[in-house]
Amino acid sequence: MSLKVLIVDDDKMIKLVHKMMVVKSGLSTEPLVFDEGKSAYDFLEAQHTDFDNYLILLDINMPIMNGWDFLDAIQGKEFVNKLQVVMVTSSVDAGDRNKANEYPQILDFLEKPLKVDACNYIKSLPTVASLL
């Protein structure tokens, strides 16, 4: 099986750091990077005929389509079972952490920026490990 990694964040520096950490940790050699949820959603919609498994490192606060809107948009889609999501955010709002429990695709809720040890932790999650 294969797992593709999507990094979805509007902060240019965070995207660069997360991409470096994902590659350095061996989580993915070529993560795909998106500026906000809408572009990631459109990409996934276009993949529906040849769908891989995706790990999405998703920020909450972004323009156009934020992380919660992205998660709402994928619910009920035929490809939703091929998606695993780790929320990677600067939010310290307990309400955001609680809201994350409402989405079965969310594996965890981590603070950014990601470091190699966080990527190694993500790799160790059973759902992710089974796809690597």
Regions found by a protein language model. Name each.
Residues 69, 82, 92-108, 116, ...:
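Alpha4 helix (beta4-alpha4-beta5 surface) of REC/receiver domains from two-component response regulators
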Residues 42, 68-81:
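Short amphipathic alpha-helix used as the core "switch/output" element in two-component signaling
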Residues 86-89:
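Hydrophobic/aromatic residues positioned on beta-strands within the core alpha/beta folds
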Residues 8-10, 34, 56-59:
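Conserved sequence signature across two-component system core domains
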Residues 62:
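Receiver (REC) domain active-site loop signature in two-component systems and cognate sites
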Residues 33-42, 67:
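Helix N-cap/capping motif at the beta->alpha junctions
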Residues 48-57:
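Active-site beta3 strand of CheY-like receiver
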Residues 3-14, 18-22:
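Conserved acidic segment of CheY-like receiver
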